């Protein structure tokens, strides 16, 4: 395999010395290419899959940078030619190309910052309603829809693993499995409490209500990562799955809840048709939860997740969504805000995620209007 060319020193995408060091990335890609081409690697299937996945992820980042540089060179040549010929239409086309390239470069830069141990993994998004009763249950349902739409817009797939309906509307809780490139790396920035202010559709007096719901995000654990769980530390409960009914409604105790007694971490699954399927998925979820807890300790990125969960209310907010008396979504960590509330609720979260990700890796940016 040929070694990719290094961008020129005059390239506007010079990452040397940053989180994505170009020379280090090329050396690492050479090493991974050599390992993939070593036939003895495939005697160890789990390791081979992990190496192949790491190589594909890094190769995609390198190609993204090189593609931007190639297109930038072409756009600049086109602009120079248009300027020499005083062709205003072509100049406008060149400006549009350069604007698009700037956006691509920004996205590629952020993708390069997804260098955490589990950033490339699929993930679970666990949503829970908080203070506010029916209003909060409805709000939790809106968040579930928001993240589903975000994932679908980015070519990811989703699967509803568990859902508990609210008494009157919305959901009390739900767990969404999101599968796609860097799913955990992006969605981990959404972990925290989300606050909604609106005129309640459930209040006959049309009063303004404040509601809370939380989103907690855990990486799906790769098969080659060993998470040791003593079966005697896990309590298993079964119960009847809830749902909308119909011919496929489950009339047996097929839903499964696992509780890890030492940590108090609990997971539940009711998506499968059988108790066996739900038990298997619940164990995957429990491994993911315990892995996330270990990552937090190792990276010292934030206090233990279960400590944060004690109060789904004012104390741990990351974002505020105001629909009345004015319309504004504001991230309380980065100060990024937008008045396009409907767009955000329809899954347009990239500006918030990008700012939070940049802040996490030490590339703090000024807060501003979300585009």
Curated annotation (Swiss-Prot):
Residue positions, PTM N5-methylglutamine: 247
Posttranslational mods: Methylated by PrmC. Methylation increases the termination efficiency of RF2.
Keywords linked to the UniProt accession: Cytoplasm, Methylation, Protein biosynthesis
Phylogenetic lineage: Bacteria, Pseudomonadati, Pseudomonadota, Alphaproteobacteria, Caulobacterales
GO cellular component terms, A-Z: cytoplasm
GO molecular function: translation release factor activity, codon specific
Protein biosynthesis as UniProt keyword: yes
Entry coiled-coil feature ranges: none
Protein name from the UniProt record: Peptide chain release factor 2
Family, per entry: Belongs to the prokaryotic/mitochondrial release factor family.
Biological function: Peptide chain release factor 2 directs the termination of translation in response to the peptide chain termination codons UGA and UAA.
Keyword Hydrolase appears in the UniProt entry: no
Xref: SMART domains: PCRF (SM00937)
Location in or out of the cell: Cytoplasm
NCBIfam families cross-referenced by the UniProt entry: prfB
Gene: prfB
Pfam hit, one: RF-1
């Amino acid at each position: 395999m040929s070694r990719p060319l290094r961008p020129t020193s005059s390239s506007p995408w010079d990452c040397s010395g940053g989180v994505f060091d170009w020379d280090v990335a090329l050396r690492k890609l050479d090493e991974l290419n050599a390992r993939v081409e070593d036939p003895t690697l495939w005697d160890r299937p789990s390791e081979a899959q992990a190496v192949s996945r790491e190589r594909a992820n890094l190769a995609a980042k390198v190609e993204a940078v090189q593609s931007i540089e190639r297109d930038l060179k072409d756009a600049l040549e086109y602009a120079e030619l248009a300027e020499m010929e005083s062709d205003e239409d072509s100049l406008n086309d060149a400006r549009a190309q350069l604007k698009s390239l700037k956006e691509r470069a920004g996205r590629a830069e952020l993708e390069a910052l997804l260098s955490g141990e589990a950033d490339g993994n699929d993930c679970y998004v666990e949503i829970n309603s908080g203070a506010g009763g029916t209003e909060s249950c409805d709000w939790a349902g809106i968040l579930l829809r928001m993240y589903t739409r975000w994932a679908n817009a980015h070519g990811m797939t989703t699967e509803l693993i568990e859902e508990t309906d609210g008494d009157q509307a919305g959901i009390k809780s739900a767990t969404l499995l999101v599968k796609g490139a860097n799913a955990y790396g992006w969605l981990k920035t959404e972990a925290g409490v989300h606050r909604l202010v609106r005129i309640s559709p459930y209040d006959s007096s049309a009063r303004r209500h404040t509601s809370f719901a939380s989103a907690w995000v855990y990486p799906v654990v790769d098969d080659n990562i060993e998470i040791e769980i003593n079966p005697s530390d896990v309590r298993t409960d079964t119960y009847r799955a809830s749902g909308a009914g119909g011919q496929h409604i489950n009339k047996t105790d097929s839903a499964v809840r696992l509780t890890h007694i030492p940590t108090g971490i609990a997971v539940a699954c009711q998506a499968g048709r059988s108790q066996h399927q739900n038990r298997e998925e619940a164990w995957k979820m429990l491994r993911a939860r315990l892995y996330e807890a270990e990552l937090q300790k190792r990276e010292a990125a934030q206090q233990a997740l279960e400590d944060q969960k004690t109060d789904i209310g004012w104390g741990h907010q990351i974002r505020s969504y105001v629909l009345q008396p004015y319309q504004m979504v504001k991230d309380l960590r980065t100060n990024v805000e937008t008045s396009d509330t409907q767009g955000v609720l329809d899954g347009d979260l990239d500006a918030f995620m990008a700012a939070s990700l940049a802040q996490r890796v030490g590339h703090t940016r000024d807060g501003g209007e979300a585009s």
